[in-house]
Amino acid sequence: MSLRKKLTHKIMPSPVDARHYEYSMLFSADDEPAKPSQRLIDLALESAKVASTTSLDDIAARTLPENYLDVWPGEHYKLLAGIVQVLKPKLVIEIGTAKGLSSLSMKKFLAQDAMIVTYDIISWKDYPNGNYLTEADFKDGRLIQYTDDLSSVDIFRKHSDLLSKADLIFADAAKDGMQEQLFINNFKQLKFANSPIVVFDDIRLWNMLKIWRDLDLPKLDITSFGHWSGTGLVDWK
C-alpha cells in the first residue's frame, strides 16, 4: 500500500466494516460531458434482466471454495454474460485476461460462430497465483489469447484489422490512471466496422474517475448491476 493510501486510510477511516473498500468521489450529473444513448439504456435494462436468471454454476465450480462468481449484483460476471446474450456479438475483445473468469463467463453464451480474443501482457499459463483457464477452453478456437499491450500505439496498429471488427470490448486492465486513457486514445484512431459496446471495469476507483468523467461518448454507469467498484458502458460511435 502506498504512503498516500496509508495516510488517507488513517485520516478518513472507513465508516463501515467490509472485506474490501476503496476511496472514490461523487460528481454532479447535470454538467456531465456525455449522456447515455437510448441504445445503452435498452441494453443495460435487458442485460440486467437476463443476468438475473443466468447460471454460471459450472464456471463457479472452478473457483471453489472462493466462490464470488455468483455474487450478483456486486460482481460483473453475470452482467457480462447477460450483455453477450442480448447483444449477440460475433467478436468480443477483452483487455486484461487475468484469471480468465470474464472470458469464460462470456464465452459460455457466445454463438458457435463467434469468438473472444483476450489480451494480456502475461500468458494465462503464467498468471500470478494461478488461473481458472485450461487448455480445453481454447480447443474449439473460439477463445484466443495474445500477450500484447494494446496501450502501445505500435502494437495496437498490429492488431487494428482484428480490433476494428469488434462488437463488444471489455476493458479490465491496470487502472493506474494512464493505461485506460491510452486504450481510449488508440480506439479513437480506429475506424470500427460496427459501433461496438465498450465495457469499462472499476470506473469508480480513484484512478479511473477522471478517465470516465472525461470520456465524451455516449456512456452509462451501471454499477448497481455490475461490479461494486464500478461498471460503465460506452456506445462507441
Report the location of each language-model feature:
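Membrane-proximal basic amphipathic "stem/tether" segments
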Residues: 1-52, 57
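Residues that form generic nucleotide/phosphate-binding pockets
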Residues: 6, 10, 43, 62, ...
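Short charge-dense sequence patches
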Residues: 23-35, 49-58, 96, 104, ...
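A glycine-rich, hydrophobic loop/mini-helix early in the fold
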Residues: 44-63, 67-71, 83
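S-adenosylmethionine/decaboxylated-SAM
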Residues: 66-71, 77-237
